[in-house]
Regions:
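Non-catalytic, polymerase-adjacent accessory regions of viral genome-replication enzymes
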Residues: 1-93, 97
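Conserved pre-motif C helix in the palm subdomain of viral-like polymerases
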Residues: 97-133, 240-262
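Active-site-proximal segment of RNA-dependent polymerases
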Residues: 118-186, 191-197
Length: 262
């Protein structure tokens, strides 16, 4: 990423990459609706205003205050008498939510800033990852060692997953051919994205040479992260009460979302 590029151009590129990522998003329909609303009118002026605010070091307190959580049922425990009978007529209150899907509700302007942060600093962090780290890897140009131009930021996850799995099977077959014993363990870290804690010092600009726009993007990105994690912390604190409330709600089962802004 050209650090000397005009901030207006960088914002447009970040917005384009954000839109491209949402094209493949199948779960977070709320975010897709946010993008539709954002693009409904005066989109060019909105991007210009965002670039000017970043360049001038303006406050984003109003947007930061709007950060919250968006909850959907992930796993439902049914108490129906006969699980082999499928019907569209049953009592919602006889079902219990066992697990939740938790999404962050963040204004589109801040999503653009987050993408801009990845564009400016992501390649430096990606270099530090082991070659066997497969998820959420950036598309890096081998010659420039920077993020490639284009609409996309990350390598498609399903392709990375297939490659990881195929290599594991190939290695297992190789060991078997050499008369070695093989045991394949497939482990999954439960609630990883809800549990991981990142220290600000782990996300430093490795160059240590910051221009004003980079400083603004960096500081704002930290605030986005901190405000989002604060919402998660509050949710964890009240989870017992929340589960009780969810058990009493039937509307959340229907095709509507239930946003919670903390």
């Amino acid at each position: 990423m050209d650090r000397n590029a005009d901030i207006n151009l960088l914002v447009i590129k970040a917005f384009t990459k954000l839109k491209a990522s949402l094209y493949y998003e199948k779960n977070n329909l709320h975010l897709r609706q946010q993008m539709v609303d954002f693009c409904s009118e005066e989109i060019e002026q909105k991007l210009i205003n965002l670039a000017n605010r970043l360049s001038n070091g303006d406050s984003f307190d109003d947007e930061l205050k709007k950060i919250g959580l968006f909850l959907l049922p992930k796993k439902i425990k049914s108490t129906q008498s006969d699980p082999n009978i499928l019907s569209n007529s049953f009592d919602f209150n006889k079902n219990e939510i066992e697990r939740l899907m938790i999404y962050a509700v963040i204004p589109i302007e801040l999503h653009i800033v987050a993408v801009l942060w990845v564009m400016l600093f992501g390649s430096k962090l990606d270099k530090e990852l082991d070659q066997y780290c497969w998820g959420n890897r950036l598309i890096i140009d081998e010659d420039t060692e920077e993020i490639k131009a284009g609409r996309h930021l990350f390598k498609p996850y399903f392709k990375q997953y297939q490659q990881w799995w195929s290599k594991a099977i190939d290695e297992a077959n190789h060991l078997l051919e050499n008369k070695e014993n093989v045991c394949i363990l497939n482990l999954d870290i439960q609630n990883y994205y809800h549990s991981i804690r990142i220290k600000p010092d782990d996300l430093k600009n490795k160059d240590g040479d910051w221009n004003d726009s980079e400083k603004m993007v960096w500081q704002l990105f930290l605030k986005i992260h901190q405000n989002t994690m604060r919402c998660y912390a509050i949710l964890v604190f009240v989870k017992t009460t929340l589960r009780t409330a969810l058990h009493c709600l039937s509307d959340c089962y229907r095709p509507h979302y239930w946003p919670i802004v903390i």
